[in-house]
Amino acid sequence: MGLKSDKWIREQSIENQMIEPFCEENIGKGVVSYGLSSYGYDIRVGCEFKIFTNIGGTVVDPKNFDEKNVVDFIGDICIVPPNSFALARTVEYFKMPHDVLAICLGKSTYARCGIIVNVTPFEPGFNGHITIEISNTTPLPAKIYANEGIAQVLFLQGDEPCETSYADKKGKYQDQEGITLPRILK
């Protein structure tokens, strides 16, 4: 399994729309950087957020998620409360090749401020926006800047295409648009 370079990422994005919209250069002046890098792609966070709250007084249950646990917010700057959590989505839409797995890591700009980003791997054959999990581990409110970088995606190409892709197994988050809350198939 090999890590893919900027040349490969550019080719896949231009010829096969692997990343849309695709930014061919790394933009970093005056913003949290985003776009193509040497061996990855810095994704942007969109302007839609779901911020966790305890107003509803419910328990967070991934098998039976209560939407009262979150407050919707749309804007250029999202304030994540101290020791709290928010969901967001990428600006970019991904169409993953059937022999490629992507891993996403948080950006050091945010990590150095106590903001931790988690994203599960993008499986081969996955199509959709990526839901981003953002944790504010500090005792202070934290700013997240919409339409700027939030994490870096690394692309790993397997030795051969997988037997069953995410699309083949009709993954529960396939073709997701916007922020997708937890789902359990029944």
UniProtKB/Swiss-Prot annotation:
Read off the Pfam families from this record: DCD
Entry binding sites for dCTP: 107-112, 152, 166, 176
Reaction catalysed?
dCTP + H2O + H(+) = dUTP + NH4(+)
Q: Which GO terms describe its molecular function?
A: dCTP deaminase activity; nucleotide binding
User: EC?
Assistant: 3.5.4.13
Q: What GO biological process terms does the UniProt entry carry, in alphabetical order? A: dUMP biosynthetic process; dUTP biosynthetic process; nucleobase-containing small molecule interconversion
Q: Which residues form the signal peptide?
A: none
Is Nucleotide-binding among this UniProt entry's keywords?
yes
- Entry annotation: catalytic residues: 133
- Alphabetized UniProt keyword annotations: Hydrolase, Nucleotide metabolism, Nucleotide-binding
Q: What NCBIfam families does the record tag this protein with?
A: dCTP_deam (TIGR02274)
Entry's family note: Belongs to the dCTP deaminase family.
Q: What does this protein do?
A: Catalyzes the deamination of dCTP to dUTP.
From the Swiss-Prot or TrEMBL record, give the protein name: dCTP deaminase
Provide the taxonomic classification: Bacteria, Pseudomonadati, Campylobacterota, Epsilonproteobacteria, Campylobacterales
